């Protein structure tokens, strides 16, 4: 891992299925002073991950889950370790309360709940009631809620309705990095705010500036691959702006920063820098919208919940979100 000079806090999310490898990874990150915070992700619902026994499948084995989280905490020193998970694999296999209690007992600094099951993937609505139940069950460390935070007011409602200590933002910030500034404003943590109204959504001209900056930073960090990775972000940024399908199609074919600059300049000139966002687009999901889909598990995975045997080594090679 590497971070920009002065970037703080240096936070990294780890995915692992085997306690010893997680222990070694955390020990290395801490010993080399590479991080200020480590998050463990047990939320990935994708079949390629769960069928190998990774991601959202791990909390079904509470002793294995305990061993992995404990291995991370035991090697983290003063660096806080947080844990993210889903409600469970499906409504018949809910694991979030036990997972929260285990993480609390072995020394996690906080837990985060994506309030959907793995079967839901990213469909339907997040079950904020589950966040409230987790908050009631886990009493000595912070509990964060995740799911359906599209606007700053969603975060306030989630905290008010559940009593949780904070929120985790996922898809809501894709194409809308200013959501974090809006959250700081409504929480009263912005230098210009005492807990006030956020700014109006940016017009097209400001979005184009943000897109160009984002792309340059991504290329600086990832090299030539960065511009290809940025292609998918262009649709997320422009969702809700009446720019037309041709512009979106062209932007998703860019090969270099010069392509992006030329297309953005032409788009702003044609549509006007003051083109506003359709307010109804704020709540349109970006990125994943698939689901529900039956969760695929390794054969016999549910036979013995107390079995702490890690899944095969190939499960460690799979990486995704949650």
Positions of predicted regions on the chain:
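The beta1-alpha1 cofactor-binding region of Rossmann-like NAD(H)/NADP(H)-dependent oxidoreductases
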Residues: 18-20, 152
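Alpha/beta enzyme core
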Residues: 20-54, 58, 62-142
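Short, structured active-site "lid" loops
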Residues: 1-14
């Amino acid at each position: 891992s590497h971070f920009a000079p002065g970037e703080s806090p240096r936070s990294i999310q780890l995915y692992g299925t085997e306690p010893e490898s997680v222990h070694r990874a955390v020990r290395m990150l801490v010993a080399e002073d590479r991080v200020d915070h480590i998050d463990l992700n047990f939320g990935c619902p994708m079949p390629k991950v769960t069928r190998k026994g990774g991601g959202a499948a791990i909390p079904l084995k509470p002793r294995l889950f305990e061993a992995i989280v404990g291995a991370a905490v035991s090697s983290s020193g003063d660096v806080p370790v947080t844990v993210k998970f889903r409600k469970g694999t499906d409504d018949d296999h809910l694991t979030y309360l036990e997972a929260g209690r285990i993480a609390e007992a072995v020394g996690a600094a906080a837990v985060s709940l994506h309030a959907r099951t793995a079967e839901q993937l990213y469909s339907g609505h997040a079950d904020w009631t589950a966040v409230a139940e987790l908050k009631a069950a886990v009493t000595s460390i912070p509990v964060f809620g995740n799911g359906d935070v599209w606007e700053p007011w969603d975060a306030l409602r989630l905290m008010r309705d559940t009593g949780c200590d904070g929120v985790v933002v996922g898809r809501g910030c894709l194409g809308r990095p200013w959501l974090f500034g809006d959250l700081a404003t409504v929480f009263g943590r912005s230098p210009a705010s005492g807990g006030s109204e956020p700014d109006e959504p940016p017009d097209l001209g400001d979005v184009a500036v943000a897109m160009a900056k984002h792309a340059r930073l991504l290329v600086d960090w990832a090299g030539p691959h960065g511009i290809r990775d940025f292609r998918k972000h262009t649709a997320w940024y422009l969702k809700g702006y009446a720019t037309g399908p041709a512009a979106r199609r062209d932007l998703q074919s860019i090969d270099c920063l010069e392509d992006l600059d030329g297309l953005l300049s032409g788009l702003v000139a044609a549509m006007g820098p003051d083109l506003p966002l359709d307010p109804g687009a704020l709540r349109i999901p970006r990125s994943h919208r698939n689901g529900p889909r039956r969760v695929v598990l390794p054969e016999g995975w549910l036979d013995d919940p107390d079995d702490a045997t890690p899944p095969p080594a190939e499960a460690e090679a799979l990486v995704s979100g949650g």
